[in-house]
Amino acid sequence: SNNGGQLLGWDLRSAGELRDILFADIGGTIYMAGSEVFRKAVIAMTESGKAAIDSAGVSPSEISLVVPHQANIRIIETSMRKLGIPFENAVWVGDKTANTSAASIPIALGYALDSKRVKANDLILLVGFGAGMTAASAVIKWGEING
């Protein structure tokens, strides 16, 4: 529709060969090789984010807001630098919520909406990574904002 949001581009990837650096055993025990996860998470978020931006046919400078997985501020800072997008364009709420895993992106987007950081027609990059190693990104054009 003319005033609705739109999915402009996306990326989904996995690197199963990295399964052993971040996984949960049966029973719920989580194993993480911290420094290796940091390095691979930055690569995954950067490559997936760039692929979604390319898929959308836009440039990093056109991205108004980045809503990343809230695992670690250092991962976000490094990924933003490598994406060529100022850190100020990222939403960071991990200091309020900690790492809420798969819920971190929608929670961060909710904070961005509540704080009026999202405007009609903004191009927003959603980008995350997780165990397995997996990564996913989407560029959306935000629709009309009511209220």
List the model feature ranges, each with a label:
Residues 42, 64-147:
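Claisen-condensing/thiolase-fold acyl-transfer catalytic domains that form or cleave C-C bonds
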Residues 10-13, 54, 67-73:
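Short N-terminal helix-initiation segments at or just after the protein's N-terminus
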Residues 1-43, 47, 129, 141-147:
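Condensing-enzyme catalytic core mediating Claisen C-C bond formation in acyl metabolism
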Residues 47-64, 112-117:
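Phosphate/pyrophosphate-binding loops at sites that engage ATP/ADP/AMP, CoA/4′-phosphopantetheine
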Residues 33-35, 60-62, 93-94:
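A short, structure-level motif marking secondary-structure boundaries and short turns
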Residues 21, 40, 44-52, 62, ...:
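Non-catalytic alpha-helical scaffold/packing segments enriched in small hydrophobic residues
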Residues 14, 30, 50, 89-92, ...:
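Short, functionally important structural connectors and interaction interfaces within domains
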